[in-house]
A protein has these predicted regions:
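Extracytoplasmic ligand-binding site segments that recognize negatively charged/polar headgroups
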Residues: 1-48, 61
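Short amphipathic alpha-helical coupling segments at ligand-binding clamshell hinges
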Residues: 21, 93-105, 113-114
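A bilobed periplasmic-binding-protein/Venus flytrap-type ligand-binding module shared by bacterial periplasmic
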Residues: 11-12, 82-95, 113-117
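Extracellular/periplasmic bilobal clamshell ligand-binding domains
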Residues: 131-168
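Solvent-exposed loop/turn segments at secondary-structure junctions
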Residues: 1-2, 56-59, 78-80, 93, ...
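A ligand-binding cleft/hinge motif common to bilobed small-molecule-binding domains
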Residues: 44, 48-69, 118
Length: 168
């Protein structure tokens, strides 16, 4: 998950109050890393109490490591929508192969691998068919999402608000 998603989430939830929210959070922020792996490593090494990660991150620790101490924070305001996509390039010179690959990605066999191969939720598999224990994971009741146009419209302001608050 990206820091930009967090900045957009704070903007979506708090709007004009975003600066005050960032100022309140600033003393609690250990560091801002260049990527998810660096920050998650600080968390798993015990150097940080919390980390910005995926709602499904605890699943890896639960099912792969039998570590039930890591939890997702579920916010009543909702979570910023994060999706990984796959697509067919319009001018591909192999449209049949692209269609076959897309069909495979959407197939039940592929979708059943997503939870424990990518540690994320499958998009085309009913919850009743998720692996054992996955339906018990806490999930947000609400998602927040900016369209591409909306995100482009607020991104510069949201980043500037974040930068100003954290540089105080």
């Amino acid at each position: 998950i990206s820091g930009l998603a967090l900045v957009l989430w704070v903007h979506a939830v708090y709007g004009d109050e975003s600066g005050a929210v960032w100022e309140k959070l600033a003393p609690k922020i250990l560091t801002v890393t260049k990527d998810w792996s660096a920050s998650y490593g600080l968390f798993t090494d015990g150097e940080a109490d919390m980390v910005l990660s995926y709602t499904t991150s605890p699943a890896y620790h639960m099912f792969a490591e039998e570590d039930f101490n890591k939890k997702a924070a579920i916010f009543p305001e909702g979570h910023y929508f994060m999706v990984e996509t796959v697509g067919k390039i319009a001018n591909t010179d192999q449209p049949e192969l692209a269609d076959a690959f897309m069909a495979y990605v959407m197939s039940r066999d592929f979708q059943k691998m997503i939870p424990t191969a990518n540690w994320s939720l499958p998009s085309a598999l009913p919850q009743a068919d998720w692996p054992e224990g996955w339906s018990d994971l806490p999930l947000p009741d609400k998602v927040l999402f900016y369209s591409e146009a909306e995100a482009a419209e607020v991104q510069a302001e949201a980043i500037e608000t974040w930068r100003n608050a954290l540089s105080q």
